[in-house]
């Protein structure tokens, strides 16, 4: 199955800005990989909370629509809240 997530590039980086994003129901994330520069992104929590329940979300390639470009990625790591059904941060790796 193919998944597409709309995202924006983050300009503010750090703990404080990440907390502000989470309070606004956004998820901070990063895309990295060998030979390419890391990209800090942000997307809506509702865009990922439902599709991450599917098992193939973690094993298949995802498409991130990033400012008019489609970037192919795979999920590398995902941090979840300890007891709330919330995703706190996602690490993607270039596919």
From Swiss-Prot:
InterPro entries: Rbsml_bL25/Gln-tRNA_synth_N, Ribosomal_bL25/Gln-tRNA_synth, Ribosomal_bL25_short, Ribosomal_L25_dom, Ribosomal_uL5_bac-type
Repeat recorded as keyword: no
Keyword Iron attached: no
A GO BP annotation: translation
Gene3D superfamilies: Ribosomal Protein L25, Chain P
Pfam families reported for this sequence: Ribosomal_L25p (PF01386)
Quaternary data: Part of the 50S ribosomal subunit; part of the 5S rRNA/L5/L18/L25 subcomplex. Contacts the 5S rRNA. Binds to the 5S rRNA independently of L5 and L18.
HAMAP family: Ribosomal_bL25
Function as written in the Swiss-Prot or TrEMBL entry: This is one of the proteins that binds to the 5S RNA in the ribosome where it forms part of the central protuberance.
Designated name of the protein: Large ribosomal subunit protein bL25
